Design a protein with these regions (language model features):
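A short glycine-rich, Lys/Arg-flanked "PGG" loop and its adjoining helix->strand segment in the class I
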Residues: 132-144
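Core SAM-dependent methyltransferase catalytic element
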Residues: 220-222, 226-244
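Conserved class I S-adenosyl-L-methionine
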Residues: 1-49, 63, 67, 86, 149-180
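A short SAM/SAH-binding and catalytic strip from SAM-dependent methyltransferases
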Residues: 118-131
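A short acidic, Gly/Pro-enriched loop at the edge of an enzyme's catalytic core
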Residues: 110-119
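Short alpha-helix
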Residues: 203-220
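Class I SAM-dependent methyltransferase SAM/SAH-binding core
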Residues: 55-109
């Protein structure tokens, strides 16, 4: 995840990504929809040639970088994440890898000194300012013909729906007491998801239809190779190629 920039700082509703970081992986490990996203990404990597350079934008606690580093140990990988707690979690998790660099700059501040062959951006774009410009930045960071793996939460977050879904799964997996314990440990996630919903409603965070994000991606200089709704229908996944 990537936090908001100062452009939105005058608005009162925005997620506290540092608070989110503390419990993010706990709940993600028990969320089948999130695990399905990771499996999709792993499957995608199995279909491409080894990238020389990989950038992950808004890499959060490093789950996608972890998969990329395992799949491509010879690639140079840079994880960009402005939030201090998120990137600390990522550094701890990924400490065994020698091919990962960490950068706290926001996307709009990243130069293209070393263009990538693959850019990963998962559940981050919607929380950035000026998404059309940020999509152009993603294109700027890619070599011509390079690939963008983009997943974006563009549809309104129904927190009650997610709570029901996760609790039902956890109850089957861990029993009632176990489910309640995990929910209590991950209560900050529920709080921040409620804030995300409010930020979507007030326009601080970007919402879009599948057609709208496809149009924005195309305008930014990409050909869309694949698009589908994922994450219980709340997110759009697009695999794109940078136009020459």
């Amino acid at each position: 995840m990537t936090r908001d920039s100062s452009e939105s700082s005058d608005r009162s509703v925005h997620a506290d990504w540092s608070a989110y970081a503390a419990a993010y992986d706990l709940l993600s490990e028990h969320n089948p929809a999130y695990q399905a996203l990771l499996q999709r990404f792993e499957g995608f990597l199995a279909t491409i040639e080894t990238p020389r350079v990989i950038h992950e934008i808004g890499g959060g606690t490093g789950n996608y970088t972890d998969i990329a580093a395992r799949a491509f140990p010879e690639s140079r990988i840079r994880l960009f994440e402005p939030d201090e707690n998120m990137i600390k979690s990522a550094q701890t998790k990924l400490a065994a890898y020698q091919n990962i660099d960490y950068d706290t700059r926001a996307l709009e501040d990243v130069d293209a000194a070393e263009p990538a062959d693959l850019v990963i951006c998962v559940h981050a774009l919607y929380a950035m300012p000026a998404q059309e410009q940020r999509l152009a930045d993603l294109r700027r960071l890619l070599n011509p013909g390079g690939l963008l793996y983009l997943v974006d939460l563009g549809h309104y977050m129904n927190v009650t729906d997610w709570r029901r879904y996760l609790f039902s799964h956890l109850k089957k997996e861990r029993g009632l007491i176990g489910a309640l314990q995990i929910f209590w440990q991950g209560r900050e996630i529920a709080k921040q998801n409620t804030t995300i919903r409010e930020a979507q409603k007030t326009g601080v965070y970007w919402t879009h239809t599948s057609a709208q994000i496809a149009s924005a991606v195309t305008t930014a200089g990409f050909d869309i190779l694949r698009q589908e709704r994922v994450y219980l229908g709340y997110s759009d996944l697009l695999v794109c190629r940078a136009k020459p």
